[in-house]
């Protein structure tokens, strides 16, 4: 929402308050507003989905115990809520799930071609009862690589949209 307000404010400054937001000269601004709204919604939905997946895998109690142990080992001044948000946020989880289901259908039997994620899921399932928290950290180190790739992809797409609209 803040991004929309900033974009509208800059559009008024650029147009010196003489044009309406929806004129043909400001099409790029409308595209950017809807792009940022959609991107924010995807982040919220995928973050919620990732935390639900964790709670299913580890159980409600072990999920919160693991987060508390993680916060005890962290430097002073780090908020547990920030860590919880960071851990549960996964930008491209929905895309991963879709691609995994699609590739499993194309390959036939998913057990013949295990993905990295299915290997991690089996590892989590076998060590779930022992309450081994480093498994949780390994799982999220793997997830962090995908998060960084997702952020990079979104930044590239954003730059391409801006360049395309500015030079068209």
Swiss-Prot record:
Subcellular location: Membrane
Protein name (database record): Putative uncharacterized protein YLL059C
Record flagged with keyword Transmembrane: yes
Membrane topology: Multi-pass membrane protein
One GO term describing the cellular component: membrane
Gene source species: Saccharomyces cerevisiae (strain ATCC 204508 / S288c)
Keywords: Membrane, Transmembrane, Transmembrane helix
Transmembrane segments: 27-47, 147-167
